[in-house]
Amino acid sequence: MTLLRGDDFFTSRAVTVAVEPRTPQTAFPEHYHDFWEIVLVEQGAGVHVFNDQPYALCSGSVFFVRDNDRHLFEDVEGLCLTNMLYRSPRGFRFLSDIAAFLPYGPNGEWQGQWQVNAAGMQQLKQSLNSLAGLAQSDAPEAIAASESLFLQILVQLRQHCFQTEGNGSERQGVQALLGWLQNNYSEEVNWGGLADQFSLPLRTLHRQLKQHTGMTPQRYLNRLRLLEARRRLQQSDDSITTIAHACGFSDSNHFSTQFRKAFSQAPKSLRHQAFSREE
């Protein structure tokens, strides 16, 4: 597995933050870093596999990545994102500790998958452009200004994001709906009911989901289900039928057809490959 080193991305060893745009982000194999980063997806689609857990990417997706996390990008389609790098939560010159602004849950668990709304993303892009300029200098005043702006960006993320691990029931709009789908993909979905739940006209729901994900709502839902099914096939001993039902497919034959269409491989073949690698 590849280790990405901060010396290849930060302007100098004195600099504590960096901005790395990826326009586009191509498929990239599993890797880890000796620094921390925040990944903000501006547009496009793809799959982000984070510590063996797959996530479907869309505009507004945000991922907080620690130095001990493993991740990769695959199945990308017009994916554009920006990486905001920092040494560590305590690796700043003028900030003492940013842990309070990082996505720790009430019991200390890491909740690093967020969704940001469109207005928030526009504000963040402006701040990131300014930060990219400041991060080119290792003058003390530039480092102080870049760390100050970095903290402002963390505050902006808090204001405009929410964790996709939550059920999103208290929030409205397409971003909340995306978070709900990430957490409830296995349920039977009534799009009209969800439109009411998230205060969206049904036609608006279909149009905005297509804009954010590049897919129709049903195709995006199936994508979430298939990604989770692939993970379970590789990591569990459950039968293919059990996995299909657990991921929201009522018919295992239909599941197998959809799986082959998405991954050019039958579920049984993937299961066999996964077990062969372990032997």
Swiss-Prot record:
UniProt site positions, description: Interaction with sigma-70: D251
CDD domains noted in UniProt: cupin_RhaR_RhaS-like_N
Give me the positions annotated for DNA binding.
192-213, 240-263
The alphabetized list of GO BP terms reads: positive regulation of DNA-templated transcription; rhamnose metabolic process
**Main localization category:** cytoplasm
A single GO cellular-component term from the record reads: cytoplasm
Which Gene Ontology molecular-function terms are recorded?
DNA-binding transcription factor activity; sequence-specific DNA binding
Keywords in UniProt for this one?
A: Activator, Cytoplasm, DNA-binding, Repeat, Rhamnose metabolism, Transcription, Transcription regulation
Instruction: Work out whether the entry's keyword set contains Cytoplasm.
Output: yes
Q: Where in the cell is it found?
A: Cytoplasm
Is-annotated flag, keyword DNA-binding? yes
Q: Where is the HTH araC/xylS-type domain?
A: 175-273
Pfam families per the record?
AraC_binding, HTH_18
InterPro entries with a match to the protein in the record: AraC-bd, AraC_XylS_family_regulators, Homeodomain-like_sf, HTH-like, HTH_AraC, HTH_AraC-typ_CS, RhaR_RhaS-like_N, RmlC-like_jellyroll
> NCBIfam families from the entry?
PRK13503.1 (NF010028)
Oligomeric state and interaction partners are given as: Binds DNA as a dimer.
Question: Main role?
Answer: Activates expression of the rhaBAD and rhaT operons.
What is the name attached to this protein's record?
HTH-type transcriptional activator RhaS
Organism of this sequence: Pectobacterium atrosepticum (strain SCRI 1043 / ATCC BAA-672)
The opening ranks of the lineage are: Bacteria, Pseudomonadati, Pseudomonadota, Gammaproteobacteria, Enterobacterales
What gene does the UniProt entry assign to this protein? rhaS
